[in-house]
């Protein structure tokens, strides 16, 4: 709902999304859309390390819900990762390969999508609501570095090529142990690889989101998730849903 004073909004329907964004701009209102994962401290830590990502692997798994079963997992869960990916890659989508399978409901309960972007980046995204555990992870491959981050635990680590000073000071290492949080320099096929934790200042994403909105409203700042950014994610999510529905063999005949 949009009123003359500043207001937050849940994800609107497609027919209303861009109209809502345009109306907010015309009225000088601050419109922020509730993609709460954008306010996870993990994402802030990731952006500090991000340099021209080439491949993203995103996984979001959840137990079967007692709500939102009237929509598929793309609109229920994956849309949050779609919005994040568009924000991180910042390049037009050139192609979409999507598959989705209904398991316990009429819509897709598990879906996998591969995006190819104009700048050459590829993103592989999996969302499922048929899982015994909650998993929310993002992995980023970029030049000379790999990042693995966990939204749920607000933790992560970085693998990168060693700097010259690290090459000189370190001895010959063993294979990297992913169970430790300490900095390790490893010799691997003639390359020195450093594994180190990603510093995450932990916090409650919903609280951060609300505080961010209030600050934007008070100071007239641009929201982290604008109406247009959310509309772009919604358009893409609905296109994925359409392709999954059209490929459903139950529609044949």
Language-model regions, residue ranges each:
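Rossmann-like NAD(P)H-binding beta-loop-alpha module
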Residues: 40-61
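C-terminal helix-rich "cap/oligomerization" subdomain common to oxidoreductases
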Residues: 198-200, 208-253
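Structural detector of well-ordered beta-strand residues that form the stable sheet scaffold
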Residues: 4-6, 32, 57, 124, ...
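A general structural signal for well-ordered alpha-helical segments in protein cores
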Residues: 17, 39-43, 81-82, 207-211, ...
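Rossmann-like dinucleotide-binding domain that binds NAD(P)(H)
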Residues: 65-141, 151-153, 228
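Short glycine/serine/threonine-enriched helix-capping/active-site loop
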Residues: 32-35, 56-59, 98
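Beta-strand-loop-alpha-helix segment that lines the small-molecule cofactor/substrate pocket
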Residues: 1-35
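NAD(P)-dinucleotide binding in Rossmann-like oxidoreductases
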Residues: 103, 123-208, 226
